[in-house]
Amino acid sequence: MALVPIVVEQTSKGERSYDIYSRLLKERIIFLTGQVEDHMANLIVAQMLFLEAEDPEKDIYLYINSPGGVVTAGLAIYDTMNFIKPDVATLCTGQACSMGAFLLSGGAKGKRFALPNARVMIHQPLGGARGQATDIQIQAQEILKLKEMLTRKMAEHSGQPFEKVAADTERDNFMSAVEAMEYGLIDKVLTHRDMK
C-alpha cells in the first residue's frame, strides 16, 4: 500500500486536512502515475469532468510519470482531454512511455511540457492473442487498426509525416526531453516553474 501524504491548511474556520492529491486537484493538477489501466483512467476522466464543471475556462494540468499501459484505457483519457472545454496542459515528470507518450503529445498545442531529465518513449501497440486461429486473426486485425490510428494521431500531434512516425515506432524509441521537443511531441522543456 502506497503512503499518501496529508497536508494541513489553516483557514478562518480552523484546520482542514487533505491528502496531497486532493489538495493539488484544487489547483487543477491531476497526476497520471504508473500503469495506464481502466481504474486509473476512470479516476482521471472523473477528475477532468469535475474540473470542467468547476470552471470550463481554466486550464487543467496533467502531470505524467507513466511506463504506459492499456491502449483503450489511455484512449478514454485522450478522448476526454479533447471532449472537455478547458485546455489540458501536459507535463512529463520522470517518464512518459508508450500510452504515456501518446497522452503527453495529445495535450493542448503550446502547452505540452517535460522536465529536463524526463524520458519519452514511443513504440507500436503491444498485444498478445491466444485461442483458435480465427480469434487470433481477429485480435491481430484489431491491433493493426489501433496501430494505424495511434500513428496517425501521433503524426498529427507531432507534425511529423505518418511514414516517419510509423518507422520510428517499429521498435522502442527513447528520447530525452530535448529530443521529444525536436520531434514535436512536446512544445517546451521546463527548467523552472513557467508553464507559458
Swiss-Prot record:
Subcellular location: Cytoplasm
Pfam families: CLP_protease
SUPFAM superfamilies: ClpP/crotonase
GO biological process, one term: protein quality control for misfolded or incompletely synthesized proteins
Active site: 98 (nucleophile), 123
Keywords from the named record: Cytoplasm, Hydrolase, Protease, Serine protease
Enzyme class: hydrolase
One GO cellular component, as annotated: endopeptidase Clp complex
Catalytic activity: Hydrolysis of proteins to small peptides in the presence of ATP and magnesium. alpha-casein is the usual test substrate. In the absence of ATP, only oligopeptides shorter than five residues are hydrolyzed (such as succinyl-Leu-Tyr-|-NHMec, and Leu-Tyr-Leu-|-Tyr-Trp, in which cleavage of the -Tyr-|-Leu- and -Tyr-|-Trp bonds also occurs)
Broad class of where this protein is predominantly found: cytoplasm
Single annotated GO MF: ATP-dependent peptidase activity
InterPro entries named among the record's database cross-references: ClpP, ClpP/crotonase-like_dom_sf, ClpP/TepA, ClpP_His_AS
Alphabetized Gene3D superfamilies for the sequence: 2-enoyl-CoA Hydratase, Chain A, domain 1 (3.90.226.10)
EC number: 3.4.21.92
Self-association state and partner proteins as the record states: Fourteen ClpP subunits assemble into 2 heptameric rings which stack back to back to give a disk-like structure with a central cavity, resembling the structure of eukaryotic proteasomes.
Protein family: Belongs to the peptidase S14 family.
Functional description taken from the UniProt entry: Cleaves peptides in various proteins in a process that requires ATP hydrolysis. Has a chymotrypsin-like activity. Plays a major role in the degradation of misfolded proteins.
Record-given protein name: ATP-dependent Clp protease proteolytic subunit
Source species: Actinobacillus pleuropneumoniae serotype 5b (strain L20)
Name of the encoding gene: clpP
